[in-house]
Amino acid sequence: MSPISRDEVLHLARLTRLVLTDTELASFSSQLDVILAHVSQIQAVDVTGVEPTDNPLKYVNITRPDETVPCLTQQQALAEAPEAIYGRFVVPQILGDNK
């Protein structure tokens, strides 16, 4: 694989709307060369017969089951509120105008 040129890095920077210095262009060029070399090695691996997966672990639905549990009634929840109107908590306004 041929090394990534400064012009190619500059083109990618323009596509992503990044403004890079000359030092960054040189640095990214060498970094992209290393990254693409690793990708090339990975692409060379023979995966014939290997089942595609998004997770190497075989755990399936290991979360606990949902269970209904008793909860507060509306009246119980509002009983200790400093202020409630129409079955809802009253809180200070934090957004918009104070109209």
Swiss-Prot record:
Signal peptide: which range, if any? Answer: none
The molecular function terms in GO held by this entry are: asparaginyl-tRNA synthase (glutamine-hydrolyzing) activity; ATP binding; glutaminyl-tRNA synthase (glutamine-hydrolyzing) activity
- Disulphides: none
Q: Which UniProt keywords apply?
A: ATP-binding, Ligase, Nucleotide-binding, Protein biosynthesis
Q: Which InterPro entries match?
A: Asp/Glu-ADT_sf_sub_c, GatC
Q: Name one GO biological process term.
A: glutaminyl-tRNAGln biosynthesis via transamidation
For the protein in the UniProt heading, the enzyme class is: ligase
SUPFAM superfamilies xrefs: Glu-tRNAGln amidotransferase C subunit
Instruction: Report the EC code(s) recorded for this entry.
Output: 6.3.5.-
Under catalytic activity, the entry for this protein gives:
L-glutamyl-tRNA(Gln) + L-glutamine + ATP + H2O = L-glutaminyl-tRNA(Gln) + L-glutamate + ADP + phosphate + H(+); L-aspartyl-tRNA(Asn) + L-glutamine + ATP + H2O = L-asparaginyl-tRNA(Asn) + L-glutamate + ADP + phosphate + 2 H(+)
Checking PANTHER family in the record gives:
GLUTAMYL-TRNA(GLN) AMIDOTRANSFERASE SUBUNIT C, MITOCHONDRIAL (PTHR15004:SF0)
Family named by the database record: Belongs to the GatC family.
Instruction: Relate the protein's function as given in its record.
Output: Allows the formation of correctly charged Asn-tRNA(Asn) or Gln-tRNA(Gln) through the transamidation of misacylated Asp-tRNA(Asn) or Glu-tRNA(Gln) in organisms which lack either or both of asparaginyl-tRNA or glutaminyl-tRNA synthetases. The reaction takes place in the presence of glutamine and ATP through an activated phospho-Asp-tRNA(Asn) or phospho-Glu-tRNA(Gln).
Q: How does it assemble?
A: Heterotrimer of A, B and C subunits.
Q: Which named protein is this?
A: Glutamyl-tRNA(Gln) amidotransferase subunit C
Organism this protein belongs to: Mycobacterium leprae (strain TN)
